UniProtKB/Swiss-Prot annotation:
GO terms for molecular function: heme binding; iron ion binding; monooxygenase activity; oxidoreductase activity, acting on paired donors, with incorporation or reduction of molecular oxygen. This is Cytochrome P450 6a2. It comes from Drosophila melanogaster. One of its GO terms (cellular component) is endoplasmic reticulum membrane. The lineage of its organism: Eukaryota, Metazoa, Ecdysozoa, Arthropoda, Hexapoda. It is an enzyme of class 1 (oxidoreductase).
């Protein structure tokens, strides 16, 4: 009994100490900040009634003209430097990257192997993994995978055509799920070499498990908040974050795929094959002569896992939001269709790698979609050493401090993007892009830790949208929700319910 009492006193004392130390952090340093909530910090409503983006919009708009390049923020229990000056963001992501190379995210390779993927890794582990994976995402590899994506997109067109009668007015379709089925089949083929066929059979474990990654948590809210606030401690305590059924499904899938390929000596020029080679070689010599260790089964599974979940969700959401905006802006849709059809006529009606790249207005439309609907609301970095902010010698981002770069808020800053709520692809004309700082548009991050799969994600979104817009017209209908409502339970920008649009054959 006394042991239990002493234990409770010790735990209470530790919590009180952590609360006092963390929640007085910015006050002691004289940095502007909002007073934190005892449980939620500056994120009251987290995973309850507020979308992550809203925290960052509101905080940025409150402090962006404060005169400080960064202000204090409490990401739940974790003090963080909230970057309101885009020039400082540029320094952190690019110029002074070596001091902010880590993200400081939870990962526990021993007990929760799927968390040790490229997005979460830090230090030498991240550097080595990035070097291993970079050859998979070259333009040459994209060209090789292009026919595979085209093949899936042709089946995609057939499925839509079957649901849309030739008669006037077409049919009302739920776009979000349809786009997700397309990208699931693409990623399943390119990552695993598996014919998922979710376009024809929407209910599948592959699709269900992919969805769960973005909506389900292994723990309740309090434990989840603890892991987010103290990722290193959570890892030392051997905590896990991946839902058990998701963990079991992907580990079994990867093990079975590897066993089959090694047994049959079957090779494909895909993501999985590169990783299997890294696993088999044990050590790999890079082009610069550096020798790095190979990859064990847990590391391999984690990289395939993140390629799948990041690739299908982000691209499908981008396509859905893009069609939603095109349905409301028929003039933009008509201009885009004219470009696509003109380019196709020059290529005898065939979508090729070169023709997709030639569709410059399509690229502008997608870029504007990613600005207005920023899927990942912020970037995180961690200071590896004390960092004196240039031009502000009394402002220091101390070693170990988390850094938040609110990308979604930059994207809706009226000083950077006049009339930010208006969908306007002209913002991304070549002239305007050249005149803009790269850190003012961050859907894929920037600098050495930008999104390694950017080329692939853009390729599949361009192909899918080109196939749709060249054959169908999308418009709003009575069931189209304007404006959209977003789910606070999703870790990316996801809607509550579907996106319904009228689809008609051209």
């Amino acid at each position: 009994m006394f042991v239990l009492i002493y234990l409770l006193i010790a735990i209470s004392s530790l919590l009180a100490y952590l609360y006092h130390r963390n929640f007085n952090y910015w006050n002691r340093r004289g940095v502007p900040h909002d007073a934190p909530h005892p449980l939620y910090g500056n994120m009251v409503g987290f995973r309850k009634n507020r979308v992550m983006h809203d925290f960052f919009y509101d905080y940025y708009n409150k402090y962006r003209k404060s005169g400080f390049p960064f202000v204090g923020f409490y990401f739940l229990h974790k003090p963080a430097a909230f970057i309101v000056d885009t020039q400082l963001a540029k320094n952190i992501l690019i110029k002074d990257f070596s001091n902010f190379a880590d993200r400081g995210q939870f990962h526990n390779g021993r007990d929760d192997p799927l968390t040790q993927h490229l997005f979460n890794l830090d230090g030498k582990k991240w550097k080595d993994m990035r070097q291993r994976l970079t050859p998979t995402f070259t333009s040459g590899k994209m060209k090789f995978m292009f026919p595979t994506v085209i093949k899936v997109s042709e089946e995609f067109v057939k499925v839509i055509t079957e649901q849309v009668p030739a008669a006037q007015n077409g049919a009302v379709l739920e776009i979000k799920e349809l786009m997700a089925r397309f990208t699931t089949d693409v990623i399943g083929t390119c990552a695993f070499g598996i014919e998922c066929n979710t376009l024809r059979t929407p209910v599948s474990d592959f699709r269900t498990m992919g969805q769960k990654v973005f909506t389900d948590m292994r723990h309740g809210k309090l434990l989840t908040m603890f892991v987010f606030s103290f990722p290193k401690l959570a890892s030392r305590l051997r905590m896990r974050m991946m839902p058990e059924d998701v963990h079991q499904f992907f580990m079994r899938l990867v093990n079975d795929t590897i066993a089959l390929r090694e047994r049959e000596n079957f090779k494909r020029n895909d993501f999985m094959n590169l990783l299997i080679e890294l696993k088999q070689k044990g050590r790999v010599t890079l082009d610069n002569g550096e020798v790095i260790e190979g990859m064990d089964i847990g590391e391999l599974a984690a990289q395939v896992f993140v390629f799948y979940v990041a690739g299908f969700e982000t691209s499908s959401s981008t396509m859905s939001y893009c069609l939603y905006e095109l349905a409301q802006n028929q003039d933009i849709q008509d201009r885009l269709r004219n470009e696509i059809q003109t380019v196709l006529e020059e290529q005898e009606g065939q979508l090729t790698y070169e023709s997709i790249k030639a569709m410059t207005y399509l690229n502008q439309v997608i870029s504007e979609t990613l600005r207005l609907y920023t899927l990942v609301p912020h970037l995180e970095r961690k200071a590896l050493n004390d960092y004196v902010v240039p031009g502000h010698e009394k402002l220091v981002i101390e070693k170990g401090t988390q850094v938040i770069i609110p990308a979604c808020a930059y994207h809706r800053d009226e000083d950077l993007y006049p009339n930010p709520e208006t969908f306007d692809p002209e913002r991304f004309s070549p002239e305007k892009v050249a005149a803009r700082e790269s850190v003012e548009w961050l859907p894929f991050g920037d600098g050495p830790r930008n999104c390694i799969g950017m080329r692939f994600g853009q390729m599949q979104a361009r192909i899918g949208l080109a196939q749709i817009i060249s054959r169908f017209r999308v418009s709003v209908c009575d069931t189209t929700e304007i404006p959209l409502k977003y789910s606070p339970m999703s870790i990316v920008l996801g809607t509550v319910g579907g996106i319904y649009l009228r689809v008609e054959r051209i």
